[in-house]
Amino acid sequence: MPALSTGSGSDTGLYELLAALPAQLQPHVDSQEDLTFLWDMFGEKSLHSLVKIHEKLHYYEKQSPVPILHGAAALADDLAEELQNKPLNSEIRELLKLLSKPNVKALLSVHDTVAQKNYDPVLPPMPEDIDDEEDSVKIIRLVKNREPLGATIKKDEQTGAIIVARIMRGGAADRSGLIHVGDELREVNGIPVEDKRPEEIIQILAQSQGAITFKIIPGSKEETPSKEGKMFIKALFDYNPNEDKAIPCKEAGLSFKKGDILQIMSQDDATWWQAKHEADANPRAGLIPSKHFQERRLALRRPEILVQPLKVSNRKSSGFRKSFRLSRKDKKTNKSMYECKKSDQYDTADVPTYEEVTPYRRQTNEKYRLVVLVGPVGVGLNELKRKLLISDTQHYGVTVPHTTRARRSQESDGVEYIFISKHLFETDVQNNKFIEYGEYKNNYYGTSIDSVRSVLAKNKVCLLDVQPHTVKHLRTLEFKPYVIFIKPPSIERLRETRKNAKIISSRDDQGAAKPFTEEDFQEMIKSAQIMESQYGHLFDKIIINDDLTVAFNELKTTFDKLETETHWVPVSWLHS
């Protein structure tokens, strides 16, 4: 039989061979019927398509591309769920329809299987009909690649056995579905582990690459798949598992910063939850302290740290009569609407750990969210607010404060102040109608809740600056406040940028402006540090006022995003 011509191109050789076969085989075919059959078979479109697929896979194998992510199917489900909460247009409807098609779901599932290399054969579990006197043994082979196994182990103090203590959601062990909490580990890659410490076994696993073979004795009870709905939390503190002596496995811990959004994957353990960062496409979870555990140990570890309302020096009583005008807060004495009934220790009862949150986007017919500005005296908060008001008087508004002071000839009721009697003011205080109030020279000044409602009712963004301990009481379904902390730059930058600026002085009755002093700078920095330390978990945004123009532009950009983009808010705001 003569040699067959296969063509010169290596990538298209098989395709050319297929096309040449009928002619090459013709001298060896006895009947015309057989020859016709060969021509029809090798000319079949489906066969040509299979050859093309083969060539594509051969090229893919040569390139060895690395998958961008391992959980495309889960990402598509999350995207579809997210789109359901968006205003539907033709493009979104088309995308939702596409993502719901079985063939697209199957394609993404196959992609994930290939990306995770989850196609190697795994030995099935041993049959259940084994002598009750003998322990049933399972031999499991997992492909770990470079990722952690996703399980923690411990030594049983009574029996000395090595037990699977925890399965991390989304990890290799979890995806296999073959290893469960309570299983006893006997061998790893043929190495007996009965007499080894957990640390030694971890080293064996860390040094193993590719396939790992386990010999295990199943526990008495296997985990049932969790059917919990998705739960998202906002972290209210920084966490580094490497600095946590209590965590059972530092390598399994998940680091996060204050303000990060985490998705809770499992709450089966009352002490250690499993979570992942919300924006992380990697499905593998990590350990974080549970809310109850973190609250308990913080309360025991730091009972001396009590969150007290910031004390304001006498120098800051400057312009107190003006403090509520444009909602300025350089007050000598002020109280929140809750402080008349609750002691200063009310703030200490709350240990900031986590807050359950949900996505929220303002609808066009909704009132604007209340914008709360917080910052130390002299940081430039009022100047930023003034620039905002000037930039768009139809869009931004401020509250008109109440006072018991006598109206002056050039003043109009309801413009500079709302003038009321002392008796009525005190009655409103008792009825908790004031967000904040204070007294200066035997006259009351205060910002009422109704004044905030009045601005919002005009379809305006209400700009309100308050003392930081008041913020928590404004966090309600009605106002949905967005809290911005205006932070000073370093003291070196303050000396450089504020050398010609002035601050309102209290050294004369008129509250005249005076140049900043070194003491002003130091007190501004110290006050900002205390605010951020005690109330930073309530801040949605931090803007450093190094340069006024830059800070103003950042503030404007923040407002634009606040009104058009999706943000995370407490669940209670939408489901109460």
UniProtKB/Swiss-Prot annotation:
Locations listed in the record: Membrane; Lateral cell membrane; Cell junction, Tight junction; Cell junction, Adherens junction
Membrane topology: Peripheral membrane protein
Domain SH3: 228-298
Modified residues (Phosphoserine): S409
Signals that turn on the gene: Down-regulated in patients suffering of passive Heymann nephritis (at protein level).
Post-translation changes: Phosphorylated by aPKC which promotes dissociation from the cell cortex.
Matches recorded under SMART domains: GuKc, L27, PDZ, SH3
One Gene Ontology term, aspect cellular component: lateral plasma membrane
Ranges of residues in domain Guanylate kinase-like: 368-560
BP GO terms, sorted: bicellular tight junction assembly; establishment of cell polarity; positive regulation of protein-containing complex assembly; protein localization to adherens junction
Residues in PDZ domain copies: 139-220
Chief location: membrane
PANTHER family given in the database record: MEMBRANE-ASSOCIATED GUANYLATE KINASE MAGUK
Subunit structure, as described in the record: Heterodimer; able to heterodimerize via its C-terminal L27 domain with LIN7A, LIN7B and LIN7C. Forms a tripartite complex composed of DLG1, MPP7 and LIN7 (LIN7A or LIN7C). Interacts with DLG1 via its N-terminal L27 domain. Interacts with PALS1 and PATJ.
Protein family per UniProt: Belongs to the MAGUK family.
Protein name as it appears in the record: MAGUK p55 subfamily member 7
